[in-house]
Design a protein with these regions (language model features):
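Catalytic phosphate/metal-binding cores of nucleic-acid and nucleotide-processing enzymes, i.e., regions
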Residues: 1-127
């Protein structure tokens, strides 16, 4: 098992600052949609050989053309998608006992069309 990568374009309203400014009903709908998207994308990427690991590494890379999210905003924006990956069985849970390595990074791209966020889940095999 190498890992599973899903690619999303998170709504800026899901960032920490965006959620703070948004109406609670709008936020609830955005979160539910992002979670469902994570579930569907996870199912698309999962194959029959995938076994839900007890412990995993999660790597998040934001590809941005103009201004990147702050790391706390990026973590907040992808949280519902990660919940969807838990729902579909890619991750056992999203607590520290199951996600033992969590990496965030940015990568500059040339055009707005290239803006995206990738979430890669890799199993951590036991000793």
């Amino acid at each position: 098992m190498n890992g599973i990568t899903v690619e999303i374009r998170p709504d800026g309203r899901l960032s920490k600052n965006g959620l703070r400014r948004a109406n609670w009903q709008e936020s609830r709908q955005l979160i539910a949609q992002a979670r469902e998207d994570g579930f569907v994308l996870g199912r698309i990427e999962m194959d029959d050989s995938w076994e839900t690991p007890d412990q995993a590494s999660v790597s998040i890379v934001q590809y941005y053309a103009r201004q990147p999210f702050d790391f706390d905003g990026l973590a907040c924006a992808v949280a519902p998608t990660i919940d969807g990956l838990v729902d579909c069985g890619i991750l056992a849970d999203d607590d520290p006992a199951h996600i033992v390595r969590y990496e965030l990074s940015h990568c500059k791209v040339k055009t707005m069309a290239e803006n995206r966020v990738t979430i890669t889940v890799r199993p951590i095999l036991g000793p």
